[in-house]
Design a protein with these regions (language model features):
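Conserved, mostly hydrophobic/aromatic
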Residues: 33, 95, 176, 206
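Gly/Pro-rich active-site loop or hairpin
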Residues: 42-44, 74, 112-118, 122, ...
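Active-site acidic/histidine proton-transfer and metal-coordination neighborhood
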Residues: 76-173
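Active-site beta-loop-alpha junctions enriched in small/polar residues
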Residues: 16-18, 36-40, 65-68, 99-100, ...
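Acidic (Asp/Glu)-rich catalytic clusters
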Residues: 22-28, 45-62, 78-93, 130-135, ...
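Acidic-and-aromatic substrate-binding clefts and catalytic sites of carbohydrate-active enzymes
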Residues: 20, 37-49, 68-78, 148-156, ...
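Boundary/entry segment of secreted carbohydrate-active catalytic domains
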Residues: 1-23
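N-terminal capping/small domains of soluble enzymes
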Residues: 8-13, 25-40
């Protein structure tokens, strides 16, 4: 299988439409560009033209939000086929997906919903990730989620769950530092101790982002600057 193809240290950004002019005209010194896979499932048009321009200048990371790896529904064949076609066209350095579910009964909820960290969930995800990797002919990264509920029947921590999933499938991890911090504050655990449950060799990419502070909890909104505690946690990672 094709591994991830970035240097050991590369700093990139999430490419959005407001960035196009600066990226294409000034060519800033970036290690890579990350885009949401689903925004480029059409074979042509302005979006695909922009992505091909980006790919000509930088390595690209395809980050999925809609494969719904943990859904009780079967894996969406049409979605996976579109992703495969995009991967073959763009030849990205990294392919990643959120570790979540986002639909059931054929209805897509347009959200990234958490999963119970149980052996049953682990077996389901291992099979799904194995199929995706076989179909794409490459390893993928899976990303830890921000969550606002905990399941009573969970029998392992999220990071222990991620570590075992990587061991079983050979997939890598996209470690979202902000998501880990948000969950640590909301559920009252030590995020540094959780980092110790992950093998550094399994982490293929990290995300840094901001969150919103409310009276009740932290919400992962990507709507503010990265805060000092998240930077400190990144230093620990």
């Amino acid at each position: 299988m094709t591994p991830t193809l970035l240097p050991d240290v590369a700093v990139g950004i999430g490419l959005r439409q407001p960035h196009y002019r600066e990226v294409f005209e000034r060519r800033p010194a970036l290690g890579f560009l990350e885009v949401h896979s689903e925004n480029f499932f059409l074979d042509g048009g302005a979006s695909m033209h922009a992505l091909e321009r980006a790919r000509a200048a930088y390595p690209v990371s395809l980050h999925g939000v809609g494969l719904s790896l943990g859904s009780a529904d079967r894996l969406a064949d049409a979605h996976l086929a579109k992703l495969k076609r995009l991967v073959e066209r763009i030849e990205p350095a990294i392919v990643s997906e959120h570790l979540c579910w986002g639909g059931v009964g054929g209805v897509h909820f347009n959200d990234l919903l958490p999963l119970p960290h149980t052996g049953e969930t682990l077996a389901l995800l291992a099979a799904r990730i194995g199929r995706v990797q076989d179909e794409l002919g490459r390893t993928i990264l899976v990303e830890n989620l921000s969550a606002y509920v905990e399941f009573r029947d969970g029998d392992m921590t999220e990071t222990a769950f991620l570590a075992e999933l990587a061991r079983r499938t050979g997939c890598g991890l996209l470690l979202d530092i902000n998501n880990l911090y948000v969950n640590a504050v909301n559920f009252g655990f030590d995020p540094v101790a959780r980092l110790a449950e992950l093998a550094a060799s399994s982490i293929g990419q990290m995300h840094l982002a901001g969150h919103t502070v409310t009276d009740d909890c932290l919400i992962d909104t990507h709507g503010s600057a990265v805060c000092d505690p998240v930077w400190a946690l990144y230093d620990e990672a």
